[in-house]
Every structure is written in C-alpha cells, then in structure tokens.
C-alpha cells in the first residue's frame, strides 16, 4: 500500500510487493480470495497480474493513484476497489488546475467493482447514493469496517494503541 495513505495500517509493516515473498504465500495457500495493493507502488502491477492469473482478486486500496495508474491496474487485472473513497484521493489541484483522483478514475472504469463502508461515518449517505447511481447495484458492495473490538463497548481495549473508541466508533487517535 502507499505509505501516504496508510490509514489504520501500521506504517512499519508497509512494503512493496515482492515476488520472492508473495509467490510462496500464494503457492502454499488454498484460501486466498483477494489481496489489496496500491497500483502506483513499485511491483504492484506485476503483483496484480500474478494474483489474477492465480484466481485471486487483486483489489486497489490505500492508494494515491491517478487515472493512468488506475487504467494500468485495470489492464493488469485489478477489477475491484477496497473501501472505496477511504484512504484514496478524489479531485485535487496541481497548481491552479484540477486533476482526477482515484475515485473519479475508478468511476471511469465501467467494469470495476467497488465496496463502500456503509456506516454513514466513513462515507456519508449522499456519497453512497452517488456511488449507487454511477456504479449500480451490480458493481457496488456495502460492507462494514468492523475490528476485533466491534460491539465491545467504549471501555474495550484495541489491539493498536493508536486506536480509540468513542461513542461506539473506533477511530485513530
């Protein structure tokens, strides 16, 4: 994943895809269904192509990808986006001009599916409605972002010291 979009991922655990590491994992596992990567990172397109060839869904996540990156990823086999809208940019400026971010680029890939955290906090209902209008029910999944402390109450202790729980919502401090 892209370290600049780590979100709740522990920065010290982030690294670029390395075939010397992921190939043995894939070859010795029978349960991998999906694996996330940021397509703009070194080795990510090769990783996505390998996963797709092995029947594992490569998914875009924690990314700063722009259109050229998303298009290259789609062509390499990435056909899904994890936690759409979260840990990825939308429109942004370079100087005085607007540029598409990951979000708009994904909307331009008609056959790319997305998953949206449907808690009304990660993504507001109005944006979920917009996503539904653009992607449709066939290409949009509603998911949770539940952690190990889900439904445990505000006094629960999270596994990561950066995580706090307030009013039933788990978030980074």
Regions found by a protein language model. Give the residues of each.
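Histidine/acidic-residue-rich, glycine-tolerant segments that coordinate divalent metal ions
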Residues: 1-99, 151
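Active-site-adjacent C-terminal substructures of enzyme catalytic domains
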Residues: 69-173
């Amino acid at each position: 994943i892209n370290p600049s979009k780590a979100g709740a991922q522990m920065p010290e655990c982030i690294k670029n895809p390395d075939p010397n590491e992921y190939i043995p994992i894939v070859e010795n596992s029978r349960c991998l269904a999906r694996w996330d990567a940021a397509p703009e990172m070194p080795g990510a397109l090769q990783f996505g192509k390998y996963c797709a060839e092995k029947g594992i869904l490569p998914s875009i996540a924690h990314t700063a990808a722009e259109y050229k990156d998303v298009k290259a990823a789609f062509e390499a086999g990435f056909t899904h986006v994890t936690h759409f809208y979260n840990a990825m940019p939308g429109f942004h400026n370079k100087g005085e001009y607007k540029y598409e971010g990951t979000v708009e680029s994904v909307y331009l890939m008609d056959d790319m599916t997305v998953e949206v955290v449907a808690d009304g906090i990660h993504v507001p209902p109005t944006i979920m409605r917009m996503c539904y209008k653009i992607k449709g029910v066939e290409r949009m999944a509603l998911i949770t972002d539940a952690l190990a402390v889900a439904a445990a109450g505000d006094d629960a202790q999270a596994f990561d010291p950066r995580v706090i729980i307030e009013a039933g919502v788990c978030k980074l401090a």
